[in-house]
């Protein structure tokens, strides 16, 4: 699993709106918060993404870009974003390349293999992981105050 202090590789995924999102391009604007979640339309995932939605301004004030990431297809993510009025990109890692590279692939999620473990990474513009949190179980949600604290220290 990718740890704090390690560098990650660039990647490009398709967002819920069909646009290609490249990590390196987002990092040119400042740090990036990668918020991995197991599946759209599930209770804990919905609550987590809505908490990011409701506090997005606080992340923007820290010059950070928030990107939600799951293995759902972009069409499902588009409907999820619409229904929840999400105001940040949701990226489809349908081929499981990014979750595998970062070591947050869950092969035992209520009988499903290959979903994202609920996790959050703060990535600095030089691709270094400044903060990392991975849920011990999928019912846990990240402490967004801790994420913002990590961003404040950059």
Where are each of the predicted segments found?
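Chalcogenol-based redox active-site neighborhoods
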Residues: 1-154
């Amino acid at each position: 699993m990718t740890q704090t202090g390690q560098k990650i590789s660039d990647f490009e995924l398709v967002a819920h709106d069909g646009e290609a999102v490249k990590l390196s391009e987002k990092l040119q604007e400042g740090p990036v918060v990668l918020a991995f979640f197991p599946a759209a339309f599930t209770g804990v995932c919905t609550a987590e993404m809505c908490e990011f939605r409701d506090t997005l301004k606080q992340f923007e004030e820290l010059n950070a870009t928030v990107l939600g990431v799951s293995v759902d297809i972009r069409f499902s993510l588009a409907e999820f974003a619409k229904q929840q009025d999400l105001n940040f990109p949701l990226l489809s890692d349908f081929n499981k390349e990014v979750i595998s590279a970062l070591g947050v692939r869950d092969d035992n999620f209520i009988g499903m293999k290959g979903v994202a473990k609920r996790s959050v990474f703060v990535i600095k513009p030089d691709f270094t992981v400044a903060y990392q949190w991975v849920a011990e179980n999928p019912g846990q949600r990240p402490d967004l105050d801790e994420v913002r604290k990590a961003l404040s220290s950059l």
